Amino acid sequence: MNMKRIYLLYLLLLLQAGHAQDSSQNYILTRTMLKSDTKSYLSKVVYYDGLGRPFQTVNKAIENTNKKGVSLATLQEYDAAGRETKTWLPAVITPDYLAPASFKSSAPASHGNDSRPYQEAVYETSPQNRIVKQYGAGADWHSGHPVATEFMGNSATAQLRCTRYKVTSAGALEASGDYANGTLNVTRTTDEDGNMSYTFMDKIGRTLLERRMNGSEALDTYYVYDNYGNLCYVLPPAINGNISTDNLNLYAYQYNYDGCNRCIRKKLPGTQYIEYVYDNSDRLTFSQDGSQRALSAQNWTYYKYDQLNRLTEQGLCTNKVTTSGTTVHIMNYYDSYSFIGTQGFTGSNFSTDTSGYGKGALTGQMVAGINGNPVWKAFYYDIRGREVKRVESN
């Protein structure tokens, strides 16, 4: 008798799963349950063509045993080379599947009878499959307002020339003429409003220059690398070719590296440099900015880690060798709740009844307060590692 009930239930589920889908099409039905009784859910059906490409996606509203929701569908079209061309905006459909031709004829009604409720991509005639035009959804964008992309090489003309910057062995910045014609790949992009921009890349794919046109005026942002490929300078338009020390300190982004290619000094426009110190495991252990360096007793921000390279402590010290004069700003606890009942974790709301679900996760934290009163936090998780509760001291 029990086996008979199981078979009947299985048959009912099969019939329900196939309901309202087109059985002549390949599809995957996904249901997201909203209640534990499995009677209320969201349905998503993705239909595939004979080549296994998704061409129609149908999303239904909340369904239950008493009513059916409205279906919203999108359509994806491909060209003869299998490339995505037209992506249709979601449209209301009845029934839950429409053949592509029927979908295209009915979709405008969902978008104010706009004749082109889809985005479109146009490709160049080459095996590289690069997009040369992109149209936004709507007839207005299709009437001469695409995002157009052209591919070319650099040259001596004003808009296609690129200054060659290099970093010396001492870390200084030098300009050494222009790149030879045809040695860089240039992408020219024209947006829907006719504004042009250029991106210059070298043969290994690094961006060297981004040029945005403001009418006839070029606004250039240069990216300069050292011989190891590390980004050392970012020169915004305000530099305008003047790479004097004063101008670089005022406008440029500057980075210095050690022999392990770790950034040990960073300088942002108009600020003092920030210094970084690492341990033998390449973990950041100390940092110091200009404000800390200007103090009579120079402060450093220190960082401590556990054996799994997780940050356990962060604060200030006055000596980066002995970490003397320590002021703790952040203290992190992981894996267990053994800290409950110690220090600031003494309130009745800090529970230890966690069933061991904190393994591998941040379970507690102390954050120093501005007024000197730290905030104590505990994080609780379920069996799947999802945070289900957070307790903070007041």
Regions found by a protein language model. Give the residues of each.
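Beta-strand elements of repeat-based all-beta scaffolds
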Residues: 20-394
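Bacterial Sec-dependent N-terminal signal peptides
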Residues: 1-24
